[in-house]
Structure formats: structure tokens, C-alpha cells
Regions:
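Short proline/glycine-enriched turn/loop motifs at strand-loop junctions of beta-rich domains
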Residues: 65-70
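Beta-strand signatures of extracellular beta-sandwich domains
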Residues: 72-74
Length: 362
């Protein structure tokens, strides 16, 4: 990264450029030399929509935070090397910037500078990489390390931990929004004729002998011909999927060599869970999910999603700082009115989203 005449420049991701080209012209031959270094600048961009929006020749980034004093966009190359650039504008409490030559496949996250005062419900800490709540795709999972917590584990949550969490965090991924839906539409089966089949994306096909091993337990397995025939034999008109938006495996489960199997531990509401993809996590999961929906719809089968909008995977005040907590804790969560250090917990999950605010409902 370098700064020239007040403008900030950084190196674009080689993987992002390759994926964008593959989407346009098909698979590329192995490169015979390294990609040239590209220098691009950040422009003001626009505040809406939130998230990372690829616009053909670059990407607009926007994130909401009422309490932030400064927001850094963090871009990661194929080696995990991080480049930081300040989002230059703030409009309607959204920090935003447009970066030319950032393509689908680019990994990104944020660092939010602002007050760290847990006793007043403020938990900004720029040493903690925070993922975009509006990301459409993620690569990787949380690798549990003390650095992903906003406070030292040897102290209480009022103290601030300044270890960098980036090496242990998943990253958001810029996606290409284009997909050939071939005129797809919801079958709109009348309710009195609806037969719903509830299932789990992984468990339903993980051991299915008629599904290729490379597809078992994935989105594409849900629309494999053998599975489609099973739906029709049962008279199914709608498939209801247990949580498929991005979730994490809790620390205490991983310590016991277990997994968050059911998925009720959301961290990315706009992103299909990456571990259910068969071909990759740099946006491929989005296209596979869309292909599954399109195929089921073509067969007259509706798709219903089981969603988890009451809480997130960040838990209570002793949980990790992954996204919402480090971006704008009080805007996204319901805090105790008398002691905003603590979270209102209606369901025994550690926190409750503040669903009465426009921010959480957007």
C-alpha cells in the first residue's frame, strides 16, 4: 500500500481477477508468470446497499456504525497478506468507499476504530478484525485463539486485549451477483396442496450411495437426480432446509472435537454456509446454492429456509468479537438498560438482536 497526493493505493488480489475472468470466459490455463501489480485508488462510493457490491469494474464497500470514529477496509491477498485503507466517506451513519479493480473472489473485512468502554456498552477495538454482517460469502472458519476475544481471557471483559485477531478470522468474499436464472420463479404451490420435507443439507445426502462422493452433504446434492426422484416419490412440493446461512462452531465444541452440526449459531445472515459447497469458498457456494434453488423450482419444488434472527454466535459479554459486537454493539444488540455491559438474553443463547431498530432489521 502507498499514499500519493493524498490518495491511497493498494495491490489488487490475483485470485479475484482470475475468478472474475473465469466467470466471464471459463477456466483459465495455469499462469506462466505472476500477475502484474495493479495500483488502484479508493473513491467516495455510496452508502447503499450495505456490504460489498461488485459493479463490473470495481467494488463498493459500505458498513453501518454510529459509534465508529474511523473504519479501515482490510483486503487480503492469496497469501493472507493484509492491506488496509480508510473508508473515506460517512453518509447516514454508513462508512463507505468504492475501490476500482477489486473483483469477485477478493477477501475482505474491517477494523473499526472507536471507544472501548464495556461498562457503557461500547466494544470497538481495531485490533480485532470484524467480518461484514452483510457479506454475501465467507472463506474459512473461526480458528479459536485468545486473540479473537476483545478482552484478555485472564481478566474480565472490562479490560481490552490488543492482540491482532486477523490470522484466526474468516474473511468476507466479494461475489459476482450475476447468475443465469433462466426465468426461474417460485412455484407458488397452494397451501392446501403443500407437502413440506424438512431436512439438513449435510446429513440428508452425506451417506447417500447414489450421490457422487464429491457432492455428498452439499447444496448440489440436494438437487441430484436421485434425490429429486426421492422427493417426487414422496409427493414433496417444498423442501425446508435447516440453517444454511453462515454459522460458526463454538469454542467449547471445538475443544471437545465436536461441531455445530445443526447451524443455529449464525454470524452471516446473507451468506450461504461455506462448508456446504463442493467446489470452493470464494463465491462458489453462492452459485451452487442458486443452482440448487433453480433446479428445485424447475421441478415444481419450493425452497423454505429455517432462519435464526433472534441471536448471533458472539454470545454474551464473555464471547468473541467477530462482527456486530465490534462494529456497533448497542445498535445491533439489546443491552441491559441499567448495566449495558451485559446483554439481554431471552433465549439462553447469550445475546438478543435488537430487532426493534432499523439497523438490525436492514
Amino acid at each position: 500500500m502507498e499514499t500519493t497526493y493524498g490518495r491511497t493505493y493498494f495491490h489488487a488480489s490475483a485470485a479475484g481477477r482470475e475468478i472474475a475472468l473465469q466467470m466471464a470466459v471459463g477456466p483459465l490455463p495455469p499462469p506462466v508468470e505472476q500477475y502484474p501489480v495493479l495500483f488502484v485508488e479508493i473513491w467516495p462510493g455510496h452508502p447503499f446497499p450495505l456490504g460489498a457490491s461488485f459493479e463490473g469494474t470495481g467494488t463498493n464497500f459500505s458498513i453501518f456504525s454510529d459509534v465508529a470514529e474511523r473504519v479501515e477496509l482490510c483486503l487480503f491477498d492469496d497469501r493472507g497478506v493484509e492491506t488496509r485503507v480508510d473508508l473515506p466517506e460517512q453518509t447516514a451513519l454508513c462508512w463507505h468507499g468504492y475501490v476500482p479493480n477489486v473483483y469477485p473472489g477478493q477477501r475482505y473485512a474491517y477494523r473499526v476504530h472507536g471507544p472501548y468502554d464495556p461498562s457503557h456498552g461500547l466494544r470497538c477495538n481495531p485490533q480485532k478484525l470484524v467480518i461484514d454482517p452483510y457479506a454475501r460469502a465467507f472463506e474459512g472458519q473461526v480458528r479459536w485463539d485468545p486473540a479473537v476475544y476483545g478482552y484478555p481471557l485472564s481478566a474480565d471483559d472490562l479490560a481490552r486485549d490488543d492482540r491482532d485477531s486477523a490470522p484466526y478470522m474468516p474473511k468476507g468474499v466479494v461475489i459476482n451477483p450475476w447468475f443465469n436464472w433462466n426465468g426461474d420463479h417460485n412455484p407458488h404451490t397452494p397451501w392446501h396442496q403443500t407437502v413440506i420435507y424438512e431436512t439438513h443439507t449435510k446429513g440428508f445426502t452425506k451417506l447417500h450411495p447414489a450421490v457422487p462422493k464429491s457432492l455428498r452433504g452439499t447444496y448440489l446434492a440436494l438437487c441430484h437426480p436421485a434425490v429429486m426422484q426421492h422427493y417426487h416419490d414422496l409427493g414433496v412440493t417444498a423442501v425446508e432446509l435447516m440453517p444454511v446461512h453462515q454459522f460458526i462452531h463454538d469454542h467449547y465444541l471445538v475443544d471437545r472435537h465436536l461441531r455445530q452440526y445443526w447451524g443455529y449459531n449464525s454470524i452471516g445472515y446473507f451468506a450461504p454456509h461455506n462448508e456446504y459447497a463442493s467446489t470452493g469458498q470464494l463465491g462458489q457456494q453462492v452459485n451452487e446454492f442458486k443452482e440448487m434453488v433453480r433446479t428445485l423450482h424447475l421441478a415444481g419444488i419450493e425452497v423454505i429456509l429455517d432462519v435464526v434472527y433472534n441471536h448471533t454466535a458472539e454470545g454474551n459479554q464473555l464471547g468473541p468479537t467477530l462482527a456486530f459486537r465490534g462494529i456497533d454493539n448497542g445498535a445491533y444488540y439489546r443491552l441491559s438498560p441499567d448495566q449495558p455491559r451485559y446483554y439481554v438474553d431471552y433465549t439462553g443463547t447469550g445475546n438478543s438482536l435488537s430487532c426493534g431498530t432499523r439497523t438490525s432489521c436492514s
